[in-house]
């Protein structure tokens, strides 16, 4: 065949393949949109006042009328708040990536970094960056895009090219940690829990979620006699703190594993190894035997799939350090992802049985899991498969494996993630938290409905075990609280049994690999002034909702109007996520934030409008058919002060 003819034939074949691929992806998106992106018909009457009254719905079948009430709470974790804690996170934060000569260490052939924020808001790997660095400074980092990246919501595998210079190129595992006062003291919850407990109680909440750190109780691997490896004084201190929670009139929700693996377990492989189940059960028995009469709700594992992804698949958290082969094969049936989750599921089942067999409470213990869920959607036509595959790995598998050992399913929800290629897209006209999580209250409603449909045959109730937003300005947080509570209320109206709602968190604290950058607290903390606390306006708004059980039209309107005025005035606020020239967010935090404007968009519950796919091809097709569309192109957002339009 002559060369011109061969080239022409190859070109025709390429066009046919491209057309077929486009058609297939378009069909997939059409199905996905019908199932997941249709406008929510809100069951809330927005002309009513109050808009929501949580006291109108019983949360349980208990005989005690007090137990029938929907409960509000606040949540935290040992690694975030406890001082005098020699845990894996402190070791991780104080490590340097440079050797004694100032040369950058490279412990792995490639670093697998997860771009998805996952849990507790700051659950992302630090990019080991200095604040405000220019994207041009990252030119030596070359992304190697592989299939696994899309499967795990934006894994981005990066290899370092070129030689590293010493000195200024040295970096840290945890952002916004080395540049703040007394970072290792966290919030001094160990030495002075009353500072936090008093603030929590004064909001009016009835449930306080806290944790017990495994490494504090078992600082050494129990290879011989268990007693020789246990810090019994620490166990008694935990019992005293839990008693203090109850003395403040709050019930206790106790987490047994919250993203903190003992350093000694990390050395041998942690949850990749069966013996970790045995060690964990030693820890569980210690805690249950000593404090079960003081605990009302138990969370055995917090976000297990997030911990496994970031530790064993990505090597982004302490206790992991996978090699290139482990990274590449991590999501195969025999890979480390399924392997570690398998042992964690077994540990959950054994812990569940032990708690129920040994509980000293008169009433049956309530034991569950805190499961992280994001609402994910595709940015472009060819991102649908990545979203579907990510959900297939993270949405239901772990809960499915333990659903016969659950008294409640805890939902940790922070927002939405827009997937574009190998990472997460920063959508220009969407509002985001400081840590890069898209604000989308409708997503919580969608998730609750979806989970209820899957597990309603088991009659398992739900608890919102975490929901919060990093926002130092407090302008986003106030409507964020109200709109997510309205989403929860709407789900209850639709028949979802939700026992309660816990906000993350009381005071600004250490947010995993993001350090002290993102501000999640209802209370601001002045780290340079002996950790002085100052309640933000959202603290008092949250307290008003908690004490009355109601969301009023006035509160909603005032919170929204204040945020929109800031957007109209083009005010800016801190943003702790680096973004490349294509609008994709880097996986980790910054030591110092960049500034991002508030966004003019109506993201209130039941108001958010999906604009469709935003890749160039989809936009081009939409432009062609726009003259024939009857859909309104202007969405109006109105209240008694502001009226403006968004094209």
UniProtKB/Swiss-Prot annotation:
GO biological process: carbohydrate metabolic process
Gene3D superfamilies: Glycosidases
Comp. bias (Polar residues): 123-132
Glycosylated residues, chain numbering: 169
Catalytic activity, as annotated: 2 a 1,2-diacyl-3-O-(beta-D-galactosyl)-sn-glycerol = a 1,2-diacyl-3-O-[beta-D-galactosyl-(1->6)-beta-D-galactosyl]-sn-glycerol + a 1,2-diacyl-sn-glycerol
Keywords for the protein's UniProt record, in alphabetical order: Chloroplast, Glycoprotein, Glycosidase, Glycosyltransferase, Hydrolase, Membrane, Plastid, Plastid outer membrane, Transferase
Stored InterPro entries: Glyco_hydro_1, Glyco_hydro_1_AS, Glycoside_hydrolase_SF
Binding site for a beta-D-glucoside: 258, 302-303, 414, 466, 504, 511-512, 520
SUPFAM superfamilies named among the record's database cross-references: (Trans)glycosidases
Chief location bin: plastid
Function: Galactosyltransferase synthesizing digalactosyldiacylglycerol from monogalactosyldiacylglycerol in the absence of UDP-galactose. Potentially involved in freezing tolerance.
Note: Rice SFR2 is able to rescue freezing tolerance phenotype in Arabidopsis sfr2 mutant.
Protein name: Beta-glucosidase-like SFR2, chloroplastic
Gene: SFR2
